[in-house]
Amino acid sequence: MILIIYAHPYPHHSHANKRMFEQARTLEGVEIRSLYQLYPDFNIDIAAEQEALSRADLIVWQHPMQWYSIPPLLKLWIDKVFSHGWAYGHGGTALHGKHLLWAVTTGGGESHFEIGAHPGFDVLSQPLQATAIYCGLNWLPPFAMHCTFICDDETLEGQARHYKQRLLEWQEAHHG
C-alpha cells in the first residue's frame, strides 16, 4: 500500500499539489492522509498515524516547499509519530524495509536551489534522507515539481501525470 502524507497548509490555494493529489488518488492501493485537514489544531493522533504507517509499503511526504523546508505540521508529525522505541532506538523497527518518497512542489526553478558551495536540490533533502535512513527506511530519489507559480495548466497537469506514473511504476516493481 502507498501511504501519502499530504501536508499542504493552504490546500484551497493549491494548484500543483492539488493536481498531484487528484492524480494519486485515482490509483488502487493508495491511502492519503491530509494532515492539515485531520489536525487543524496540530493535535496529532499518534496511534492512528502509526497504524496507517504500519500498513504502508511506500510512504510519500507530499507538500509544497516552504522556506527551503517542510511545512510545520509535517515537521511536528515526524517528531511525534516517528517516536523512540517505535521508529528508531531500542526496539524501534516499525519502519524498517519500507520505502520513502519525498514529493515536493516549488515556486522557483531548479537553478534557484543552487545554494552556496553545495549546488543542487539534493542538499535540501539531506535532513529528510537522514531521518529516513536513521529509521530504517529506503530513501527513493525525490519527485520535485518546480516553477509551479509560472507553469500553465497543461504543464502542471503533465507533471501531475508524471507523479502518478512514478507511483504506478513503484507499485508494479514491488507488487507485480
Curated annotation (Swiss-Prot):
It catalyses: a quinone + NADH + H(+) = a quinol + NAD(+); a quinone + NADPH + H(+) = a quinol + NADP(+). Its EC number is 1.6.5.2. The gene is kefF. This is Glutathione-regulated potassium-efflux system ancillary protein KefF. It is a peripheral membrane protein. Regulatory subunit of a potassium efflux system that confers protection against electrophiles. Required for full activity of KefC. Shows redox enzymatic activity, but this enzymatic activity is not required for activation of KefC. Keywords: Cell inner membrane, Cell membrane, Flavoprotein, FMN, Membrane, NAD, Oxidoreductase. Its cofactor is FMN. GO terms for molecular function: electron transfer activity; FMN binding; NADH:ubiquinone reductase (non-electrogenic) activity; NADPH dehydrogenase (quinone) activity. GO terms for biological process: positive regulation of potassium ion transmembrane transport; potassium ion transport. Pfam families: Flavodoxin_2 (PF02525). Belongs to the NAD(P)H dehydrogenase (quinone) family. KefF subfamily. It comes from the Bacteria. InterPro entries: Flavodoxin_fold, Flavoprotein-like_sf, K_H_efflux_KefF, KefG/KefF. Its main location: membrane. The lineage of its organism: Bacteria, Pseudomonadati, Pseudomonadota, Gammaproteobacteria, Enterobacterales. It is found in: Cell inner membrane.
